[in-house]
Each structure stands twice: as C-alpha cells, then as structure tokens.
From Swiss-Prot:
UniProt-listed Enzyme Commission number(s): 7.1.2.2
Protein name: V-type proton ATPase catalytic subunit A isoform 1
One example of a Gene Ontology biological process annotation: ATP metabolic process
A cellular-component GO term for this protein: plant-type vacuole
HAMAP family, per the entry: ATP_synth_A_arch (MF_00309)
Stretches assigned to coiled coil: none
Amino acid sequence: MSKAKEGDYGSIKKVSGPVVVADNMGGSAMYELVRVGTGELIGEIIRLEGDTATIQVYEETSGLTVGDGVLRTKQPLSVDLGPGILGNIFDGIQRPLKAIADVSGDVFIPRGVNVPSLDQTKQWEFRPSAFKVGDRVTGGDIIGIVPENSLLDHKVMLLPQAKGTVTYIAAPGNYTINEKIIEVEFQGAKYEYSMKQSWPVRSPRPVVEKLLADTPLLTGQRVLDSLFPGVRGGTCAIPGAFGCGKTVISQALSKYSNSDGIVYVGCGERGNEMAEVLMDFPQLTMTMPDGREESIMKRTTLVANTSNMPVAAREASIYTGITLSEYFRDMGYNFAMMADSTSRWAEALREISGRLAEMPADSGYPAYLGARLASFYERSGRVACIGSPEREGSVTIVGAVSPPGGDFSDPVTSATLGIVQVFWGLDKKLAQRKHFPSVNWLISYSKYLNALEPFYEKFDSDFVTLRQVAREVLQKEDELNEIVQLVGKDALAESDKIILETARFLKEDYLQQNSFTKYDKYCPFYKSVGMMRNIVTFHRLATQAIERTAAGNVDGQKITFNIIKAKLGDLLYKVSSQKFEDPSDGEGVVTAHLNELNEELKEKFRALEDEYR
C-alpha cells in the first residue's frame, strides 16, 4: 500500500456481512479489484452509484470499521496463467493453498494473505518455436513450449491482444515465469512478455469460431457412454439429492474420461470431499498408450472453495475454474471442468443479492440467476483457437446440482436444464437400492445422439440399433412392472418374461457398476458395446425361439421362458458375468471373449430350436 496515492483510497461507509459500501470511489470501474481495510482484504466492486461503490469481499469481514480505507487497484479480478497450474490446488480467487500453508503454518487461510498464484522462483525449461527476430506475430501464436510434466507440454502463447514484429526471443534454456522471453515492436513502441499472463476471470477468452462437437466424452461409466453420451465441448448436468453419488460420478470423470486435463472446482461442498480428492488423486494412476503409469494429479488442477470458506468467493471460484480451462483449450487441448456444485454457487448469488436488497424471484434467488448460469455454461464448446499454428481445443462443463430434497423443480435445476444438452438425473430410490451409478434411465437424456452418429457408425455400425433396442426394453419393463405388482410374473406372456429377464441383465449387470473393483471401475467403450451386443442378442434369439415354436408347433411342444432358463442356465450366467472381463488384459483378449459368447448364444439357441421343432 506504500506506493498508493491518496486519490486511490475510498473509505468504508457500511458493512453488511460480505458486502461493504465505500465512499469517495469516483473513477472506479465495475468488477475492479480493491483491498479493503487495514488487513487489505480482497474485494470486487459489484455496483456503482455516483461515487459510492458496493464491494463484495472474498474474506471474513469481521473487524472492519466505518472509515477504514479502501484501496483501488485499477485492475479487474484476474488469474495468473502460466506454467505451474497443473497439479496445483487453489482457493476460489487463485491463491495457492499449499504455498499459503507453508508461509503461515496455519490450518486456515489467514486474512489478507498475499501470495503469488504461481511459483515465481522455479526455473522452467523453455524451448522457443520457429519464430525469429523480424517475424510478425499476433495474439495466440505459440512462441515456445515448456515441458510442464511428463503428461502435458505447456504451450506458451502470446497474449490475445498482443501483436507486432519480434525484436527479441529468448534462447532455449531455463527461465522463471517473470523473465522476458519475447519482445515485440508495434507502431514504434516495444512490449515485453514473459511466460505468465493475466486474464480477467469474467471475460471469455477470444476464439476464431465455435465448431460442431462430434467426439464423445468417454467417461468409463457404461450407463453414460452408451445411453446418454456427452461430447467433448458439451455441457452436462448431474442433479441429484444427497447421497446419490454426484461427487463419485464427478470424480470418476476426472479420473477416467478421455480429456487431456481436468479442472475440478469444489464449490461450496463439504471440506472432507475436497480432502478425499486430495488424498485419492495423487495415488491414482492412468496407463499411457506406451504402457507407463502416470499420476492423475499431473493433468488435474483443483479449485477448492469449501462450504466453510467465505460465501462471496464461491461465485469467483466458478469463473476462476472456467478461465483456467479456457487457457488450456487455447493451447489446443481438450479440457473438462467439473463444478461441484452449482447450487452452492447459486446460493452465494442469492445471499449477495439479499444483502444488496435486490428484488427476489423464485425461492429468493435473484431474477438474473438464469442469465448468470447461461453465461457460465456458454463458455464451453469446441473451438478453432486464435493464433498459429492452427489448432482446435475444447472445454466440457459438467455441473453437479444439489436440489434441496432431490426436487428437480427447484429454480437452479430448472434453469440449468434449459441450458445444458445432457441431463444425467440421479435417483434417490436407486441409490437406496445400492444401484450405482444411480442414473435414472427413464428421465435422463442426451441431445447429442444425432451429432455422434457418424462416430458410432465408424466405431461399430450396429451400436445405434443396439442402444435403441436396450432403451425400448427398459421402457417396456417399466410398463410391465405395474402389471407384475398386480397379478404376478406367472400371468405374463412368455415374450414379456423375456423382456423382464433382459431388463434384469441390463440393470444389474450393465448399468450398475462397481467403482471400487479393478475390473469395473472403468469400462472402455469397446467392452460396453460388446456387452450390450450380447444382452441384445440374447433378447432377440429368446424372443424369436418362443415366437417360432408358438406359431408352428401343433404338438404343444413350445419353448417357454422356464425351458430356456433350465436348458441354458449356464449361458445366462455367462451373459451376466461379462462385466468381470478385466480391461487390463488388453482389448484383443476382452473382445475375443465377448465375441465367443455371442457365437455360443447363437449356437445354443439354434440347437434348442432344433430340439423343439
């Protein structure tokens, strides 16, 4: 504060929880960063009237008094972007928690702590690209590469608004993130740039254009990959009551999805859930194409903003997370962002809105809730990035929603469903039956099915038909359940009994998945397709056998469901045991086993029909 001039100060007029009103703030800008009080607490201007500014403070405001100074920084709330983001854990306004713990030695973050977001002293190996002195460069051009870790190369880009002629570019070597690595001249003025760049969190980073997303986001969860697929660059919502497994699905996506990297934002959730992520992730490994094992933490950034941290910072944490994701997208990577949970973010908006005495709308949420949610989800997408070389990247947003009491008519859930394209609805009843992932296949949907058809045709031309049959079986089973409860299973037609058996295979052995086993924690797409093919083949052959013998047999020798169960019991057991195929045996082995079972199904049913002909 020593360098600040007197004109840069305002004074506190009123304090109301995390909201502070200050006088003498003429010339301030909306969303400008300020330092409040003697403790220099971080705050952001959210409303201006005359020379009075309303500020939301991102730290505990107890102890502030009327008349305390408010220092303007003349810059918006920004995040630092550069090498050192991956594997790190930040709070909602990008303060590194590990560095703060080392500095303060405290369990909780002390107020007013001022620690740089990225390590200023660490030397990074810089390898310049093909640019040389005299070349013209524009914003987004990749000027060099820093091998951040063994998983990802960090591509150092020129700031989006920078351009000019190169007058200096650093030689290959080790540099800190603040050292000059390139100097450009534009209209007679020279500008220096380092590996680090700042970007305001509320402004989306510029792109050339948005592209159509056509590659699925494979999660390793059969129910999601086969029935309700997301895409890389899409938006997904996971609403569900407490204990339905939202966090487990979010963490499974972080661990096993086919993204290049993950930004996991724990926004207002319980502190022990973030602690669990911090304990689990460093121990988890992923197998690379060349067979080596790498820690998942190397491709993950955590933004922790737990429920006992100040409310206002929850709002910032979502923007911090999406800005970090966009930065990696601009390098040409496919990043996924998990927001767990957007309901807590909306509650923070509601609290701030209440403090500002704004007119409340549904359930006390502000009227602009839908617009805020939309502006956040709209920052996802597959894009053509600015700068050279030409490249494409994507940001996928998966938002968990926690409606109170599992009520999907809650304003946050309703507003979210109007925006997102994929809805994975979690069901309390399924969770109570210990059916996980507890995605309800009757209410969930994905609007990306048509966009993904070319991919499925290329992968396996039968898959679209298989999925259609599986969904029809599940739908019919739901209708038959009412009849079964009234008159019992035995009163059903034989073909309906087959539908119930197929649905049982689908529900218990396909859609249900055990995240804590070696063979089932992650299911590759080829295994999902092979398993579904065998279940649908059983359904088709069994129905066909019953119908054929029923139509053409006069002697009363008909194949019934009980006969199929008695004669082919071991085959049915094999169909339900497909999930025990271990993907670590390799694609060739698993596919061969599943194909053998398919042939065996056809052979045994043919023999059964011959016997009863």
